[in-house]
Amino acid sequence: MLQNHKLPKSISAKELNELIKSAKKIQIVDVREYFEWEICHIEGALNIPMNLIVESIDKITKEITTVVMCHHGVRSMNVIHYLESIGCKNLINLEGGIHAWATDVDKSMSTY
């Protein structure tokens, strides 16, 4: 049986780059594994692997907009559904994840 989940709000890599440049207070949570983070990451992002979200929930600032990201945008969408289920708001999924960032914003970034 399929659960009735609405798709989370999403943002493109280029839109996220503009948001970062605007100096609006946001938080970026990267839910990829540590070894993926070591390959490449967005400067200033917080790395909390998906399997550690529950025990690391206190590291997420709930009062500001949080962009959740992963490699391509699937894990981050699942994390957003969990965070919404426990009452978190102002969550945005990075469409295409770090791959989109490397392709559309920072072409010098390593990819995998």
Provide a role label for each language-model segment.
Residues M69:
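Short, surface-exposed ligand- or partner-binding patches at beta-edge/loop junctions that are enriched
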Residues M1-Q27, Y34-T65, V74-Y112:
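Rhodanese-like catalytic fold shared by cysteine-dependent sulfurtransferases
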